[in-house]
A protein has these predicted regions:
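Short, Lys/Arg-enriched, disordered terminal segments
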Residues: 1-14, 191-198
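Anionic N-terminal interaction surfaces
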Residues: 2-4, 10, 41-101
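Short amphipathic alpha-helical segments that mediate assembly, nucleic-acid/protein binding
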Residues: 3, 15, 42-45, 160, ...
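Loop-to-transmembrane boundary segments
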Residues: 10-19, 107
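Canonical alpha-helical transmembrane segments of integral membrane proteins
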Residues: 15-35, 45-55
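Phosphoinositide-binding peripheral membrane targeting modules
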Residues: 95-129, 133-135
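Acidic, Ser/Thr- and proline-rich intrinsically disordered linker/docking segments
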Residues: 123-198
């Protein structure tokens, strides 16, 4: 079921975070000790920041390993139900996304599952470094403030357009395209959502 895949993915993310946190913490601690012994206090701040980052990674990794009791699941309890719906009521699937009657998720990361009604904006985002395209994603802006990204780098224009069209056909509350109108709509809907939750 989708719930088991979601929990498995959370567990693997937790392990990656935990290992990365331990490695970063160990490296920064060893370098911190070396710099203290040598008396170079000017770079001390950088290694303290690295140590803090390592501790944050460890904390998040341990939290993800709690599975259903993780803060991520407690903050978004509907995610387990939506993940199950993806397996039971699947209506569309391709190399990039899975869509059910109620939910949408990138195929590679079920932890980013979202309700179809919560998708407010759909647009492409291209990032360049020195004029070279380094990232090409389709962003789904959600009502709760999250953003689901689908990597479409090095895919044909037709594939990208078809993907956006398919998603927009299932997400009836969503505006398509990056514009001031779309951004203000997303901002307004998120504000209403926060007011209802409080």
């Amino acid at each position: 079921m989708g719930r088991t895949r979601l929990i498995k993915k959370l567990k693997s993310k937790g392990i990656v975070f935990l290992i990365a946190g331990i490695i970063i913490s160990l490296i920064s601690t060893l370098m911190l000790v070396a710099f203290i012994i040598d008396g170079l206090n000017s770079i001390l701040i950088a290694f303290i920041i690295m140590l803090i980052c390592g501790i944050i990674f460890i904390y998040n990794g341990v939290d993800y390993l709690k599975k259903e009791n993780s803060k991520f699941i407690k903050k978004h309890p509907e995610i387990l139900e939506l993940a199950d719906d993806l397996d039971i009521n699947k209506v569309y699937e391709d190399n990039f996304i899975i869509i059910s009657n109620k939910a949408i998720s990138p195929k590679k990361d079920i932890t980013k599952v979202a309700a179809l009604d919560d998708v407010l904006g759909i647009y492409e985002s291209i990032q360049r470094t020195n004029g070279i395209v380094t990232s090409h994603i389709i962003r789904l802006e959600l009502r709760d403030g999250r953003c689901v990204t689908i990597n479409v780098y090095a895919k044909k224009r037709e594939t990208k357009d078809n993907l956006v069209l398919t998603i927009s056909n299932y997400c009836h509350n969503a505006k398509v395209g990056y514009s001031n109108e779309t951004l203000s709509y997303i901002k307004e809907q998120r504000k209403e959502y926060k007011e209802k939750r409080n």
